[in-house]
Amino acid sequence: MKVSALTGKHNYFEDFTVGEVLKHARGKTVEPLEQVWITNVTMNTAEGHFNEHLMKSSPWGKRLGFGGVTISMCIGLAAQDTAENALMELGLHKIRLKAPVHHGDTLYCYSEVLEKTDADQPDAGIVRFKHYGVNQDDKHVFEGERWVLIKRRSHWGDK
């Protein structure tokens, strides 16, 4: 497993190897404001996200985080290594929320390089990643695949 040193010059298309696993350097603690704000803005009316009184008697014992925030945070944590030289996000697939996330949890992300293919343009290639999110207890909370169009060093890198 390669441990990230945050951003650098080693995330062009040519630098990724199929089968490689990246442990991203940063973690992110989920703040209540982040969860509540986006739940309200998206008109998500599921009480599990905003009714603390109701959720105290639930199997989880407290409010649940909105899955969209979990997905965004995990992909954001991976972006330092997987999108620094991205030209375009091409798609997400097989998104799975594996366990609940609560306010105060801290998320970490790992990524695996699943596939590399040529793009229709000569200055970039397509990399398919599988991202994994875990919480502070190393519990698997998220996984999903992502396709990214990434610059080729041969066209964009230092000469």
What are these regions (language model features)?
Residues 28-30, 96, 113-117:
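Short, charged beta-turn/beta-strand-edge "cap" motif at the junction between a beta-strand
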